Regions:
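Charge-rich amphipathic alpha-helical interaction elements
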Residues: 1-121
């Protein structure tokens, strides 16, 4: 019975670790997305500045370009919020891993104590 409890604790620990890795992967993807968004906005801003300086873009077009850049910035803020929410998910997953690890240690110690008791009996 204690051996089964240890196996269940091992399985729960492995599942918690898998869930943590998944949440960390999602976080990395969200952070990469933000990085791409920032780079895209900077690239477009430079492109618009170059076009305005060279005369390819009219001054009247500049206001719509600025509005577009502002919308891009707003999307970056939304992405930062998603990243923070994902960081919280990672923290929760880390707590679950710690809890599962503690349960595994407890189950292993109980099994070893029982085995030692059997040896001495």
């Amino acid at each position: 019975m204690r051996q089964r409890a240890e196996e269940e604790a091992k399985n729960a620990f492995a599942e918690a670790q898998r869930a943590l890795r998944l949440e960390e992967k999602k976080l990395a993807e969200e952070e990469d997305m933000l990085e791409r968004m920032v780079e895209d906005r900077k690239r477009r801003r430079e492109e618009y500045s170059r076009k305005l300086a060279s005369g390819e873009m009219k001054v009247t077009d500049q206001s719509s370009a600025n509005r577009f850049l502002d919308r891009m910035k707003e999307k970056e803020v939304e992405q930062k919020d998603r990243i923070e929410a994902q960081r919280e998910q990672v923290r929760r997953a880390e707590k679950e891993v710690k809890k599962a690890q503690d349960a595994l240690i407890e189950a292993t110690q109980a099994l070893k104590a029982l085995q030692k008791h059997k040896e001495n009996w």
